[in-house]
Amino acid sequence: MGFKIAVVGATGNVGREMLNILSERGFPASQVIALASARSQGTEVSFGDSILKVQNLENYDFSDTDICLMSAGGTISQKWSPKIGAQGCVVIDNSSAWRYDADVPLIVPEVNPDAIVDFKKRNIIANPNCSTAQLVVALKPLHDVAKIKRVVVSTYQSVSGAGKEGMDELFTQTRAVFVADPVEAKKFTKRIAFNVIPHIDAFMEDGYTKEEWKVLAETKKMLDPKIKVTCTAVRVPVFIGHSESVNIEFENEITADQARDILRDAPGCLVIDKHENGGYITPLECAGEDATYISRIREDATVENGLNMWVVSDNLRKGAALNAIQIAELLVNRGLIKPRAAA
């Protein structure tokens, strides 16, 4: 007997990717339901070789559904996730709505799988921010060996992190530039085509943006509350794939060679680090891939026990959809949930 799975936000970038990955990985699902708002009702989405008709979230009964993959934004999640959880269905939420709730585990399976047992408090599990997910996958194995004191990260985040509207705006603006049409910025605060924008999410009182704060807060929650983290988040004209320049200061000595060996053996990490032209990974090459790619590992001569590295991953997969499905797999593989239809 398989599990009954509902995907909320099935017509969005991440929702569609969730359906793709459920099929690709052969998740033990007896039934998969595609859900979205009333305006998307009847829309068709792909699930493996099948076509699913999108149903209206408002009319759906979760009482016999085992897992809900929620990717419809924070407002929808705040309204629906507690209701769904109260019906006995486990919600794996991709928004920021529940990440900082003390009763909701924030999970990256390669980093803090044991924390998942706390899901029973509310039947909600939070997926981290896309840029945080790949960062902690790369940091965790190094922290286990040499203990991280401080992290300075600059992110170079693709437009798909802003949804389909962000991807459409980059395409439309790029075309407009080439044909000398006026360029209009709607989704982003400034033109994104052939430009970079040092601003993602709302500004906070201290001058940081909410996106930058998320990286700090989530890294501390999942990895170690004592780690100091500072971040600058930048939107770049790339369709898929987030990149990060990461500077790390450790309490204990660690060399670049040691770091390479550690990361090569670490789950979810793939080291591509040759000191030659093209001996590194860019977001173009990581699109559609599951791994967190790590390149440019080198020692920082300006600080004791310091390293620099370049971290790249597909933000729609490890940064969102893949991590959510890995959480669902963790629930199943550890026997934390059973198919309700079989009960």
Pin down the residues of each PLM region.
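N-terminal Rossmann-like NAD(P) cofactor-binding subdomain of oxidoreductases
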Residues: M1-I192, K228, A256, D261, ...
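A short, glycine/Asx- and small/polar-enriched loop/turn
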Residues: R39, I240-S243, G288
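Helix-loop-beta segment of a Rossmann-like dinucleotide-binding subdomain
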Residues: F119-A126, N195-D206, M309-V311
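A glycine-rich, Thr/Ser-enriched phosphate-binding loop motif common to dinucleotide/cofactor-binding enzymes
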Residues: N123-Q134, G207-L216, G319-N323
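Oxyanion-binding "anion nests"
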Residues: A193-F239
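Internal helical hairpin/lid segments
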Residues: C231-T232, P237-P267
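Glycine-rich phosphate/pyrophosphate-binding beta-alpha loops
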Residues: V234-P237, S313-K318
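Terminal hydrophobic/aromatic helix or amphipathic segment near a protein terminus
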Residues: E253-A287
